[in-house]
A protein has these predicted regions:
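Intrinsically disordered, low-complexity terminal regions
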Residues: 1-185
């Protein structure tokens, strides 16, 4: 189906077992995509994007709202505004962040998460991992809190903090059983 409508109207998209293509859209949008791929342009007023059991998803830009991605492979080329994200059992997830972001909160489980951060981003990072670790491939400096070299036995929980630029944008990540990589490209 091809649907033509004004791009500033509210839109709710629900699709199972099919491909969905949404071009740049300036109205409030909710997307629920299952068992098919999602390709989207710049989504200016996101209420919620939910993707489940899908591979090869590409979203050019998400501005605000909530991302909920499960059992999928997805790339988001730009996050803007205040975004809350929930990721579970994904086979690969890449998020690109820069100074268009105002706040990012991520809860991640069983997903290898790649954060591609612009070198000039002004962010303060707070990262907690459980049965996983932070792989810092960026030029930013991260410090592991409570890193006691004299401690005996395994350590399953890790707390990291880091800052780039003035640290204006809060980025909070909680990850269980999923490595978090922060890098540039």
């Amino acid at each position: 189906y091809i649907i033509y409508m004004p791009s500033q109207n509210q839109l709710n998209v629900a699709n199972e077992f099919g491909k969905t293509f949404v071009p740049d859209y300036s109205g409030e949008i909710t997307i629920n995509q299952k068992f098919g791929t999602l390709t989207a342009g710049k989504l200016s007023k996101v209420k919620k994007v939910h993707i489940e059991f899908s591979a090869g998803n590409i979203i050019e830009s998400v501005s605000g709202g909530e991302l909920d991605i499960r059992f999928s492979r997805t790339q988001v080329n730009r996050l803007e505004g205040k975004v809350k994200a929930f990721f579970e059992h994904n086979s690969g997830l890449k998020l690109v962040i820069d100074n268009a972001l105002t706040e990012l909160t991520i809860k991640n489980s069983f997903t290898q998460l790649l954060i591609d951060a612009n070198k000039n981003i002004s962010a303060s990072f707070t990262i907690h991992t459980n049965f996983s670790e932070l792989d810092n491939k960026s030029s930013f400096s991260f410090k592991e809190e409570g890193n006691d070299e004299d401690r005996r036995g395994p350590k399953f929980d890790h707390d990291y903090s880091g800052k780039s630029g003035a640290g204006n944008i809060p980025v909070k990540i909680k990850s269980e059983f999923g490595e978090v990589t922060i890098g540039h490209n």
